[in-house]
Structures are given as structure tokens and as C-alpha cells.
């Protein structure tokens, strides 16, 4: 292939695949452990070891090329350097070995021109991506589950995309799947913790389920947004634990 053909080859990424500046990477925390709150007193009354031994679902949300690869629409948030992908891989591997977890890889696309839309949705979705002018190939690449998680995906795992604003409880068959499999324990990882994770955790509680959030396997758009979100989730909706604690519990 000549140099000219390389230069004119269509780009597969929605944005230019440019690495983040070293100056920005240098200020990103390698992990968000410091943002994780102490477990709320009421959750301390639970036997999490027993709860995590029940039929359970491991649910990763939004962990795509968009977030972790140069050229992705959300790559500029720096998640590739903030440790949540590594914590997800470690947690998912332990859950797989435990043998009692179903796996669901939930996609969250920012490109929503074909989604059913209210007037609110229309203007909000347009603000995310309309100026990018991405091709379908670029959109498909952006939405693809990141390679590190594809490597631990297995036949029988469920993959789906959210079609509501920020919840898979509306517009997908996952709630029905969980009900039919008698699964009530849900373990969440992914982005964004103050958006899809918190929204689905709240919905899970309202639907009689038992959500648990692996905090360092999640991330907000900006690191400084995480502590308040984790504190709110932990106080009101679900235990927020570290990947180290999760791995320890499911390996016992």
C-alpha cells in the first residue's frame, strides 16, 4: 500500500484518533478508590457473601470503543487511564469463575438519530453528535464493546443497547430475562456512574432487585463528579464496593 493510499483511506473512527496530551493524562487519577465511600451502616447488616452466591447478573454498561479508544466520541474523558476498565476485567473474570453469574454487555450509543424521540430527546441527542457527521461505519466502531471485554465475552452472554434515555428497564427484554431466570442480584460496572449506572440502580430497587455497584469499575465524565455520586448511591440505593472486595467475596 502506498503512502498516498494510506492517507486517503476512510477513517473508521468518528473523531480523529489522537492521543490525549500528556499534561492531561498526568492529572487523571489512576483509580477512583479515594472516591469510594465507607459502606453505609444499613448495608453492613447484609451478608454480601451469601447474596453474591445467589443467581446473579454481571452487567457492564457503556464500556465501548467510544470511551476507551482514540477517536471515540467519549475518549477525551480519559477513562482509558482511570482504571475502571482494568477493574471491570478483574471483576468479570472472578464472576465468571464463580459460576453463578449471567453476563450482559449493555451498549449506550451517543448516535441516536434513529431512536424514538420526544421533543426533549430530539434536542438533547442532536447536541451530542450532530456536529460530528459520522458515517455508519464510524458509528458502529464507536458503539463496539471494547476489545478487553470482548476477550472475556462468551457464547450465551447477552448483548443489547439501551434505547431509553438512560435505562435498560424500558425498551429492552433484559427485565424479562432476569425474571425468567429468577435472578435478583445485579452487579454493575461501567460509565457513566452518575447517569446510566445510577439510573439503572434506582430502577432495579424499584423493581424489587438487589443492585451492587463496583465503584472502581465505574466512572463519571469527570473524576471530581464521582465522590458525590457514590455517596448518594451508597446511602440510598445500593452498596458501593471495590473490585478487590468483590473479587474476594466471589472467590470464597
What are these regions (language model features)?
Residues 221-235:
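Active-site-proximal loop->helix
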Residues 137-185:
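Internal catalytic-core helix/loop-beta-alpha segment
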Residues 194-195, 218-222, 247-248:
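Short gly/pro/ser/thr-enriched loop/turn and capping motifs at secondary-structure boundaries
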Amino acid at each position: 500500500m502506498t503512502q498516498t493510499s494510506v492517507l486517503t483511506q476512510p477513517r473508521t473512527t468518528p473523531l480523529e484518533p489522537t492521543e490525549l496530551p500528556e499534561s492531561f493524562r498526568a492529572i487523571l487519577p489512576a483509580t477512583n478508590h479515594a472516591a469510594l465511600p465507607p459502606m453505609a451502616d444499613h448495608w453492613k447488616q447484609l451478608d454480601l457473601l451469601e447474596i453474591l452466591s445467589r443467581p446473579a447478573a454481571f452487567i457492564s454498561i457503556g464500556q465501548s470503543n467510544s470511551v476507551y479508544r482514540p477517536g471515540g466520541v467519549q475518549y477525551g474523558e480519559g477513562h482509558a487511564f482511570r482504571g475502571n476498565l482494568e477493574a471491570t476485567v478483574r471483576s468479570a473474570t472472578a464472576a465468571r469463575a464463580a459460576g453463578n453469574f449471567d453476563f450482559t454487555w449493555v451498549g449506550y450509543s451517543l448516535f441516536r438519530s434513529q431512536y424514538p424521540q420526544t421533543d426533549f430527546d430530539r434536542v438533547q441527542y442532536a447536541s451530542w453528535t450532530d456536529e460530528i457527521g459520522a458515517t455508519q461505519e464510524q458509528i458502529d466502531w464507536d458503539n463496539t464493546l471494547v476489545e478487553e471485554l470482548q476477550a472475556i465475552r462468551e457464547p450465551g452472554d447477552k448483548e443489547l443497547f439501551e434505547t431509553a434515555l438512560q435505562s435498560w428497564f424500558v425498551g429492552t427484554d433484559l427485565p424479562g430475562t432476569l425474571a425468567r431466570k429468577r435472578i435478583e442480584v445485579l452487579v454493575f460496572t461501567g460509565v457513566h456512574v452518575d447517569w446510566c449506572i445510577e439510573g439503572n440502580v434506582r430502577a432495579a430497587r424499584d423493581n424489587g432487585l438487589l443492585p451492587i455497584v463496583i465503584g472502581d469499575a465505574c466512572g463519571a465524565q469527570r473524576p471530581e463528579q464521582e465522590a458525590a455520586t457514590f455517596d448518594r448511591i451508597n446511602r440510598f440505593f445500593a452498596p458501593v464496593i471495590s473490585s478487590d472486595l468483590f473479587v474476594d467475596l466471589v472467590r470464597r
